[in-house]
Curated annotation (Swiss-Prot):
This is Probable transcriptional regulatory protein ACIAD2052. Keywords: Cytoplasm, DNA-binding, Transcription, Transcription regulation. One of its GO terms (biological process) is regulation of DNA-templated transcription. GO terms for cellular component: cytosol. The lineage of its organism: Bacteria, Pseudomonadati, Pseudomonadota, Gammaproteobacteria, Moraxellales. It is found in: Cytoplasm. Pfam families: TACO1_YebC_N, Transcrip_reg. PANTHER family: TRANSCRIPTIONAL REGULATORY PROTEIN YEBC-RELATED, TRANSLATIONAL ACTIVATOR OF CYTOCHROME C OXIDASE 1. Belongs to the TACO1 family. InterPro entries: Integrase-like_N (IPR017856), TACO1_YebC-like_2nd/3rd_dom (IPR048300), TACO1_YebC_N (IPR049083), Transcrip_reg_TACO1-like (IPR002876), Transcrip_reg_TACO1-like_dom3 (IPR026564), YebC-like (IPR029072). HAMAP family: Transcrip_reg_TACO1. It comes from Acinetobacter baylyi (strain ATCC 33305 / BD413 / ADP1). Coiled coil: none annotated. It comes from the Bacteria. GO terms for molecular function: DNA binding.
Length: 249
């Protein structure tokens, strides 16, 4: 169980996420529609759908809205032209960036994404330019470290790959395939996670110690997340403690 401190950076990113309910709802609806289209309307057998439904409920999206989105996806309504496209590039300081989008118009999305990179002194790259630096995996996080032993027992028995333990959190790591089974086992054991999702996790980190570069990275991420077509933004940035303190000031 190799632990590396990432909680401060993770929490800082979450604090910066888009606060607009309308934008958040739109992104979740698109993800629900696509998840239902690809894996079916039954959340019990569709881990991707189950994960996004839980996240949608956590931001107070109504069950009716969620069910309508599921039916749209499962029935193929208004969704034939919605495609998942991932863009890759670099921000300042050599920070690798993956941008996951869902779009019905590539002629709109490509220039919008490129603008976010160029406006913040980054560069949009070609397919494969940074994706090799990331691994797709499930992450299930808990803030209550007192549950360490129980979480470890249940998660490893259910097929988790690893568990990282820090002073302020526990992170259960799974393969994408076992994510649903591990999450179900933890829930059945009465262990409710604070966050659970399949993500692109960086294999190496690009540490930023300059506050101006850090501001540029944050601006780029915020600009990308503000785009309607963008679903997720992943980077390998790791801010130094000094930079984090200045960003939070």
């Amino acid at each position: 169980m190799a632990g590396h401190s990432k909680w401060a950076n993770t929490k800082h990113r979450k604090a910066k996420q888009d606060a607009s309910r309308a934008k958040v709802f739109t992104k979740y609806i698109r993800e629900i529609v696509t998840a239902a289209k690809l894996g079916g309307a039954d959340a019990a057998s569709n881990p991707r759908l189950r994960a996004v439904v839980e996240k949608a409920l956590s931001v107070n999206m109504t069950r009716d809205a969620i069910n309508r989105a599921i039916q749209r996806g499962a029935g193929g309504e208004d969704n034939d032209d919605l495609n998942e496209v991932t863009y890759e590039g670099y921000g300042v300081g050599g920070v690798a960036v993956l941008v996951e989008t869902m779009t019905d118009n590539l002629n709109r999305t490509v220039p919008d994404v490129r603008h976010c990179f160029s406006k913040t002194n980054g560069n949009l790259g070609t397919n494969g330019s940074v994706s090799y630096l990331f691994t797709k995996r499930g992450e299930i996080s808990f803030e209550d470290v007192s549950l360490e032993d129980k979480i470890m027992d249940v998660a490893l028995e259910a097929g988790a790959d690893d568990i990282e333990i820090e002073e302020d959190g526990i992170l259960v790591i799974t393969s994408p395939e076992s994510f649903g089974d591990v999450q179900d086992a933890l829930t059945a054991a009465g262990l409710k996670s604070d966050n659970a999702e399949v993500v692109m996790s960086p294999s190496t980190k690009a540490e930023i110690t300059d506050i101006e570069q850090a501001k540029q990275i944050m601006k780029m991420i915020d600009m990308l997340e503000d785009l309607d077509d963008v679903q997720n933004v992943y980077t390998n940035v790791e801010f130094s403690e000094e930079v984090l303190a200045q960003l939070d000031a």
